[in-house]
Amino acid sequence: MSQKKSPRFELRSGNVDALLLALNTADLDAVRDDLLSRFESTPDFFSDDVVALDLRRLEGTGALALDRVIDTLATLKARAIGVVARADQRDWAGGFGLPLLDSQSRRGGKDEAPKEKAGKPEATAASGQTDAEAAGNTGKGKDSEGAAVNGKASEIAEIMAAANAASAPRAIPTLLIDKPLRSGQQIYAQGDVVILDLVSYGAEVIAEGNIHIYAPLRGRALAGVKGNPDARIFCTCLEPELISIAGIYRTAEQTLPADVLGKSAQVRLADEKLILEPLRMK
Protein backbone atom coordinates (compact mmCIF):
# COMPACT_ATOMS: atom_id res chain seq x y z
CA MET A 1 0.00 0.00 0.00
CA SER A 2 1.35 3.40 -1.00
CA GLN A 3 2.13 5.76 1.91
CA LYS A 4 2.09 8.82 -0.33
CA LYS A 5 -0.16 11.58 0.94
CA SER A 6 -2.97 12.55 -1.45
CA PRO A 7 -3.86 16.22 -2.01
CA ARG A 8 -7.43 15.16 -2.85
CA PHE A 9 -8.55 13.93 0.57
CA GLU A 10 -7.52 13.84 4.20
CA LEU A 11 -8.34 11.08 6.68
CA ARG A 12 -8.23 12.15 10.29
CA SER A 13 -9.90 11.54 13.63
CA GLY A 14 -12.61 13.89 14.82
CA ASN A 15 -15.80 14.27 16.82
CA VAL A 16 -19.30 14.45 15.37
CA ASP A 17 -22.03 16.13 17.44
CA ALA A 18 -25.21 14.07 17.70
CA LEU A 19 -28.18 13.66 19.98
CA LEU A 20 -28.17 10.47 22.03
CA LEU A 21 -31.63 8.96 22.56
CA ALA A 22 -31.22 6.68 25.58
CA LEU A 23 -34.03 4.11 25.82
CA ASN A 24 -35.15 3.36 29.39
CA THR A 25 -37.77 0.76 28.44
CA ALA A 26 -38.24 -2.04 25.91
CA ASP A 27 -41.85 -0.93 25.35
CA LEU A 28 -41.17 0.78 22.02
CA ASP A 29 -44.84 1.62 21.46
CA ALA A 30 -44.75 3.65 24.68
CA VAL A 31 -41.49 5.28 23.58
CA ARG A 32 -43.10 6.22 20.26
CA ASP A 33 -46.18 7.66 21.98
CA ASP A 34 -44.06 9.68 24.41
CA LEU A 35 -41.87 11.06 21.63
CA LEU A 36 -44.87 12.15 19.59
CA SER A 37 -46.60 13.63 22.63
CA ARG A 38 -43.48 15.51 23.67
CA PHE A 39 -42.31 16.90 20.33
CA GLU A 40 -45.23 17.02 17.86
CA SER A 41 -46.16 20.50 19.13
CA THR A 42 -42.61 21.72 18.37
CA PRO A 43 -42.07 20.51 14.78
CA ASP A 44 -38.67 22.24 14.47
CA PHE A 45 -37.22 20.80 17.67
CA PHE A 46 -34.99 18.32 15.82
CA SER A 47 -34.75 20.19 12.51
CA ASP A 48 -32.85 17.39 10.68
CA ASP A 49 -30.61 16.67 13.67
CA VAL A 50 -28.80 13.34 13.70
CA VAL A 51 -29.66 10.93 16.52
CA ALA A 52 -27.96 7.79 17.82
CA LEU A 53 -30.05 5.19 19.65
CA ASP A 54 -28.49 4.16 22.96
CA LEU A 55 -29.59 0.71 24.17
CA ARG A 56 -27.17 0.28 27.05
CA ARG A 57 -29.74 0.89 29.81
CA LEU A 58 -31.92 -2.01 28.64
CA GLU A 59 -31.40 -5.30 30.49
CA GLY A 60 -32.50 -8.77 29.37
CA THR A 61 -34.83 -7.56 26.64
CA GLY A 62 -33.73 -9.68 23.69
CA ALA A 63 -34.05 -8.37 20.14
CA LEU A 64 -36.22 -5.26 19.66
CA ALA A 65 -37.89 -3.79 16.57
CA LEU A 66 -35.87 -0.59 16.53
CA ASP A 67 -37.37 0.40 13.18
CA ARG A 68 -40.39 1.69 15.15
CA VAL A 69 -38.23 4.25 16.90
CA ILE A 70 -36.32 5.05 13.70
CA ASP A 71 -39.59 5.73 11.84
CA THR A 72 -40.88 7.89 14.70
CA LEU A 73 -37.72 9.98 14.64
CA ALA A 74 -38.13 10.46 10.89
CA THR A 75 -41.68 11.69 11.50
CA LEU A 76 -40.21 14.29 13.88
CA LYS A 77 -37.62 15.39 11.28
CA ALA A 78 -34.71 13.61 12.99
CA ARG A 79 -32.31 11.20 11.28
CA ALA A 80 -31.11 8.08 13.06
CA ILE A 81 -27.44 7.52 12.22
CA GLY A 82 -26.44 4.58 14.37
CA VAL A 83 -26.86 2.43 17.46
CA VAL A 84 -24.80 2.38 20.65
CA ALA A 85 -25.09 -1.04 22.29
CA ARG A 86 -23.45 -3.32 24.82
CA ALA A 87 -21.50 -6.34 23.63
CA ASP A 88 -24.44 -8.70 24.31
CA GLN A 89 -26.79 -6.51 22.21
CA ARG A 90 -24.63 -5.96 19.16
CA ASP A 91 -25.63 -9.14 17.27
CA TRP A 92 -29.23 -7.96 16.80
CA ALA A 93 -28.83 -4.19 17.21
CA GLY A 94 -26.99 -3.86 13.90
CA GLY A 95 -29.80 -5.36 11.83
CA PHE A 96 -31.73 -2.18 11.01
CA GLY A 97 -29.56 -0.58 8.36
CA LEU A 98 -27.68 1.51 10.93
CA PRO A 99 -24.02 1.12 11.91
CA LEU A 100 -23.00 0.11 15.40
CA LEU A 101 -21.23 3.05 16.99
CA ASP A 102 -18.52 2.98 19.61
CA SER A 103 -18.99 5.23 22.62
CA GLN A 104 -16.01 6.74 24.38
CA SER A 105 -16.75 4.68 27.51
CA ARG A 106 -16.78 1.48 25.44
CA ARG A 107 -13.52 2.41 23.77
CA GLY A 108 -12.05 2.72 27.23
CA GLY A 109 -12.95 -0.91 27.92
CA LYS A 110 -16.36 -0.50 29.61
CA ASP A 111 -19.90 -0.94 28.31
CA GLU A 112 -21.31 1.81 30.48
CA ALA A 113 -24.70 3.44 30.10
CA PRO A 114 -24.81 7.25 30.10
CA LYS A 115 -24.72 8.80 33.52
CA GLU A 116 -27.90 10.89 33.06
CA LYS A 117 -30.76 10.20 35.45
CA ALA A 118 -32.40 6.97 34.27
CA GLY A 119 -35.93 8.20 34.82
CA LYS A 120 -35.72 11.02 32.29
CA PRO A 121 -37.20 9.80 28.98
CA GLU A 122 -35.83 12.38 26.61
CA ALA A 123 -33.13 12.92 24.05
CA THR A 124 -29.92 14.17 25.63
CA ALA A 125 -27.19 15.98 23.70
CA ALA A 126 -23.90 14.13 23.41
CA SER A 127 -20.73 14.28 21.41
CA GLY A 128 -20.46 10.94 19.59
CA GLN A 129 -17.79 9.27 17.50
CA THR A 130 -18.39 6.77 14.73
CA ASP A 131 -16.66 3.44 14.20
CA ALA A 132 -14.78 5.00 11.30
CA GLU A 133 -13.44 7.65 13.66
CA ALA A 134 -12.49 4.95 16.16
CA ALA A 135 -10.52 3.32 13.37
CA GLY A 136 -8.96 6.70 12.74
CA ASN A 137 -7.92 6.85 16.39
CA THR A 138 -6.33 3.38 16.13
CA GLY A 139 -4.47 4.40 13.01
CA LYS A 140 -3.35 7.56 14.73
CA GLY A 141 -1.56 5.47 17.35
CA LYS A 142 0.26 3.52 14.64
CA ASP A 143 1.16 6.73 12.81
CA SER A 144 2.59 8.13 16.04
CA GLU A 145 4.90 5.12 16.38
CA GLY A 146 6.18 5.61 12.86
CA ALA A 147 6.50 9.36 13.25
CA ALA A 148 9.65 9.12 15.32
CA VAL A 149 11.26 7.04 12.58
CA ASN A 150 9.92 8.93 9.58
CA GLY A 151 10.13 12.44 11.00
CA LYS A 152 6.37 13.06 10.63
CA ALA A 153 5.61 14.24 14.16
CA SER A 154 4.87 17.76 12.95
CA GLU A 155 2.34 16.45 10.40
CA ILE A 156 0.47 14.54 13.12
CA ALA A 157 0.46 17.61 15.37
CA GLU A 158 -0.96 19.62 12.47
CA ILE A 159 -3.81 17.15 11.98
CA MET A 160 -4.67 17.14 15.68
CA ALA A 161 -4.68 20.93 15.84
CA ALA A 162 -7.02 21.09 12.85
CA ALA A 163 -9.37 18.56 14.44
CA ASN A 164 -9.48 20.51 17.69
CA ALA A 165 -10.15 23.74 15.82
CA ALA A 166 -12.99 22.10 13.89
CA SER A 167 -14.69 20.98 17.09
CA ALA A 168 -14.36 24.35 18.88
CA PRO A 169 -17.74 25.87 19.83
CA ARG A 170 -18.88 28.79 17.70
CA ALA A 171 -20.48 31.93 19.04
CA ILE A 172 -24.11 32.29 17.98
CA PRO A 173 -25.30 35.89 17.63
CA THR A 174 -28.56 37.03 19.21
CA LEU A 175 -31.42 37.36 16.73
CA LEU A 176 -33.14 40.78 16.85
CA ILE A 177 -36.69 41.25 15.54
CA ASP A 178 -38.02 44.83 15.48
CA LYS A 179 -41.27 44.23 13.60
CA PRO A 180 -44.56 42.69 14.77
CA LEU A 181 -45.06 38.97 14.17
CA ARG A 182 -48.40 38.32 12.51
CA SER A 183 -50.55 35.21 12.79
CA GLY A 184 -48.93 32.31 10.94
CA GLN A 185 -45.40 33.75 11.10
CA GLN A 186 -42.64 31.74 12.77
CA ILE A 187 -39.20 32.80 13.99
CA TYR A 188 -36.44 30.29 14.79
CA ALA A 189 -33.24 31.34 16.60
CA GLN A 190 -30.21 29.09 17.13
CA GLY A 191 -29.30 31.19 20.16
CA ASP A 192 -31.22 33.92 22.01
CA VAL A 193 -33.88 36.08 20.37
CA VAL A 194 -34.95 39.63 21.26
CA ILE A 195 -38.31 40.87 19.93
CA LEU A 196 -39.24 44.55 20.17
CA ASP A 197 -42.82 44.35 18.89
CA LEU A 198 -46.06 42.41 19.27
CA VAL A 199 -46.20 38.62 18.91
CA SER A 200 -49.76 38.14 17.67
CA TYR A 201 -52.12 35.22 18.21
CA GLY A 202 -51.08 32.42 15.87
CA ALA A 203 -47.45 33.59 15.64
CA GLU A 204 -44.64 31.41 16.97
CA VAL A 205 -41.21 32.20 18.43
CA ILE A 206 -38.80 29.25 18.77
CA ALA A 207 -35.30 29.57 20.23
CA GLU A 208 -32.55 27.22 21.34
CA GLY A 209 -31.65 29.86 23.94
CA ASN A 210 -33.64 32.55 25.78
CA ILE A 211 -36.58 34.55 24.47
CA HIS A 212 -36.90 38.27 25.32
CA ILE A 213 -40.10 40.02 24.23
CA TYR A 214 -40.45 43.75 24.96
CA ALA A 215 -44.09 43.82 23.88
CA PRO A 216 -47.21 41.69 24.36
CA LEU A 217 -46.80 37.95 23.83
CA ARG A 218 -50.10 36.59 22.55
CA GLY A 219 -48.80 33.75 20.40
CA ARG A 220 -46.51 30.82 21.18
CA ALA A 221 -43.02 31.04 22.72
CA LEU A 222 -40.78 27.97 22.93
CA ALA A 223 -37.34 28.44 24.51
CA GLY A 224 -34.52 25.92 24.98
CA VAL A 225 -35.93 23.70 22.23
CA LYS A 226 -32.73 21.67 22.01
CA GLY A 227 -33.25 20.55 25.59
CA ASN A 228 -31.64 23.46 27.49
CA PRO A 229 -33.42 23.54 30.90
CA ASP A 230 -31.71 26.82 31.84
CA ALA A 231 -33.37 28.79 29.04
CA ARG A 232 -35.96 31.40 30.05
CA ILE A 233 -38.74 33.50 28.56
CA PHE A 234 -38.93 37.19 29.48
CA CYS A 235 -41.92 39.29 28.50
CA THR A 236 -43.38 42.70 29.33
CA CYS A 237 -46.98 41.55 28.75
CA LEU A 238 -47.64 37.83 29.16
CA GLU A 239 -50.82 36.67 27.38
CA PRO A 240 -49.58 33.56 25.53
CA GLU A 241 -51.31 30.80 23.62
CA LEU A 242 -48.49 28.49 24.67
CA ILE A 243 -45.19 28.74 26.52
CA SER A 244 -42.56 26.02 26.60
CA ILE A 245 -39.04 25.48 27.93
CA ALA A 246 -37.04 22.38 26.93
CA GLY A 247 -40.25 20.64 25.85
CA ILE A 248 -42.19 21.30 29.08
CA TYR A 249 -45.18 23.39 28.05
CA ARG A 250 -48.31 25.16 29.28
CA THR A 251 -51.24 26.28 27.14
CA ALA A 252 -53.82 29.04 27.42
CA GLU A 253 -56.31 26.43 28.63
CA GLN A 254 -54.62 26.76 32.02
CA THR A 255 -55.41 30.25 33.28
CA LEU A 256 -52.26 32.14 34.22
CA PRO A 257 -51.85 33.46 37.78
CA ALA A 258 -53.17 37.00 38.25
CA ASP A 259 -49.75 38.36 39.20
CA VAL A 260 -48.32 37.53 35.74
CA LEU A 261 -51.30 37.59 33.35
CA GLY A 262 -50.92 40.63 31.10
CA LYS A 263 -47.93 41.81 33.11
CA SER A 264 -44.13 41.75 32.98
CA ALA A 265 -43.05 38.22 33.80
CA GLN A 266 -40.45 35.55 33.33
CA VAL A 267 -40.89 31.84 32.74
CA ARG A 268 -38.28 29.35 33.90
CA LEU A 269 -37.94 25.63 34.55
CA ALA A 270 -37.43 24.05 37.97
CA ASP A 271 -37.65 20.30 38.61
CA GLU A 272 -39.29 19.86 35.19
CA LYS A 273 -42.08 22.30 36.10
CA LEU A 274 -42.70 25.71 34.57
CA ILE A 275 -42.39 28.57 37.05
CA LEU A 276 -44.15 31.82 36.12
CA GLU A 277 -43.23 34.83 38.23
CA PRO A 278 -43.41 38.63 38.01
CA LEU A 279 -40.41 40.30 36.43
CA ARG A 280 -39.11 42.62 39.10
CA MET A 281 -37.14 45.59 37.82
CA LYS A 282 -34.47 46.81 40.23
Swiss-Prot record:
GO biological process: cell morphogenesis; division septum assembly; regulation of cell division; regulation of cell septum assembly
Protein name per its UniProtKB record: Probable septum site-determining protein MinC
Organism: Cupriavidus metallidurans (strain ATCC 43123 / DSM 2839 / NBRC 102507 / CH34)
Record note on quaternary structure: Interacts with MinD and FtsZ.
Function: Cell division inhibitor that blocks the formation of polar Z ring septums. Rapidly oscillates between the poles of the cell to destabilize FtsZ filaments that have formed before they mature into polar Z rings. Prevents FtsZ polymerization.
Keyword Cell division: yes
Keywords: Cell cycle, Cell division, Septation
Residue spans of biased composition, Basic and acidic residues class: 104-120
